[in-house]
């Protein structure tokens, strides 16, 4: 009699395990790699580390770093200081504008009312800062005092001097003054419109010479500044040559190698800009004491202005950019030499 064999428990077929469910992806991730936030965090962390490393290396050589910034600051402050002095000269009590006055000699039959009405009309014209009327009587009195011919002039039967309207223009360049003089000469009651261009031309020549001198000096000193920062960064590159070669050997990119040196150049520029701002503020304040004393002897209250905040910020931004550009040029020049041997 045959019997049916019952399988043992160990021989029973175990059920197939269920297929593992794929892990849920975090929001924002895809199959191609990390999300944008992760990449941004890594990028920012890399820049933070590069800046911290640059600060640490500059802090290890405080004296050398300070003198490098000081040399750059002197190069920055010289053209900026001359430019500020030119601006102060242009504002010297308005004397430049007074030197460019236009004198309108009226006809002899023009009375005081005609002259005052003409003065009021001219004040409302574009390009005119101010207008003053000098009557015939006032003109004769001033001429008597200045010429010393008072007794002789009193013997004249009639006053030979006309009334004058003295016009102060807003612009001091020659073409604008000529155009204004031509318009004023066409007004009624005006006999002659006289413009003394000698002082205007002298002013234009002085300011033009000063501007060109400042521009040329700025170009030369900026070139020297780029050489200074470039040579400084080159020395830092040479000191880290082995480290850089190892980084490139393990796959470090040129951007990764370049980054700390760019931050170092920008930090040099920032320090130089702050020092230059301080040098300018101290220098102008030091000169101002002598200028105030000199102007007081001439009955003027002229004083040198300080460094405007806008100019100071422009100086800082320009210094940082120059340091960055100088470092970029130095690294780009030596980057090909840093390939692993």
UniProtKB/Swiss-Prot annotation:
Family as reported in the entry's similarity comment: Belongs to the ABC-4 integral membrane protein family. FtsX subfamily.
Protein name: Cell division protein FtsX
One biological process term in Gene Ontology: cell division
Protein task: Part of the ABC transporter FtsEX involved in cellular division.
Bilayer disposition of the protein: Multi-pass membrane protein
Entry keyword Cell division: yes
Record's GO cellular component terms: cell division site; Gram-negative-bacterium-type cell wall; plasma membrane
Keywords: Cell cycle, Cell division, Cell inner membrane, Cell membrane, Membrane, Transmembrane, Transmembrane helix
Pfam families noted in UniProt: FtsX, FtsX_ECD
Ranges in the topological domain labelled Periplasmic: 87-212, 285-311
Species of provenance: Pseudomonas putida (Arthrobacter siderocapsulatus)
Subcellular localization: Cell inner membrane
Complex formation: Forms a membrane-associated complex with FtsE.
Region (Disordered): 1-34
The encoding gene: ftsX
Cytoplasmic compartment spans: 1-65, 234-263, 333-341
Transmembrane segments: 66-86, 213-233, 264-284, 312-332
Transmembrane helix keyword on record: yes
């Amino acid at each position: 009699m045959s019997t049916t064999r019952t399988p043992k428990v160990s021989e029973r077929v175990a059920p197939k395990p269920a297929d593992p469910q794929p892990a849920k992806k975090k929001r924002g991730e895809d199959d191609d790699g990390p999300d944008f936030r992760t990449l941004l965090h890594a990028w920012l962390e890399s820049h933070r580390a590069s800046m911290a490393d640059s600060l640490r290396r500059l802090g290890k050589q405080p004296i050398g770093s300070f003198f490098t910034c000081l040399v750059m600051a002197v190069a920055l402050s010289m053209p900026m200081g001359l430019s500020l002095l030119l601006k102060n000269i242009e504002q010297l009590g308005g004397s430049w504008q007074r030197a460019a006055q236009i004198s309108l000699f009226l006809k002899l039959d023009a009375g005081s009312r005609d002259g005052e009405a003409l003065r009021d009309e001219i004040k409302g014209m574009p390009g005119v800062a101010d207008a003053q009327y000098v009557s015939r009587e006032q003109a004769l009195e001033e001429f008597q005092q200045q010429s010393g011919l008072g007794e002789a002039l009193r013997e004249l039967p009639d006053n030979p001097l006309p009334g004058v309207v003295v016009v102060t223009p807003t612009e001091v360049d020659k073409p604008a003054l000529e155009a204004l003089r031509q318009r004023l000469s066409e007004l009624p009651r005006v006999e002659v419109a006289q413009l003394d261009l000698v002082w205007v031309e002298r002013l234009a020549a002085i300011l033009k010479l000063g501007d060109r001198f400042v521009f040329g000096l700025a170009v030369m000193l900026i070139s020297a500044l780029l050489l200074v920062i470039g040579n400084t960064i080159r020395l830092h590159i040479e000191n880290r040559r082995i480290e850089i070669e190892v980084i490139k050997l393990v796959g470090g990119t040129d951007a990764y190698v370049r980054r700390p040196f760019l931050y170092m150049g920008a930090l040099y520029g920032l320090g130089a800009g702050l020092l230059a701002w301080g040098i300018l503020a101290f220098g102008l304040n030091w000169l101002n004491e002598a200028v105030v004393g000199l102007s007081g002897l001439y009955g003027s209250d002229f004083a040198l202005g300080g460094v405007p905040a806008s100019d100071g910020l422009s100086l800082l931004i320009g210094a940082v950019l120059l340091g960055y550009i100088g470092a970029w040029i130095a690294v780009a020049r030596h980057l090909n030499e840093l390939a692993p041997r």
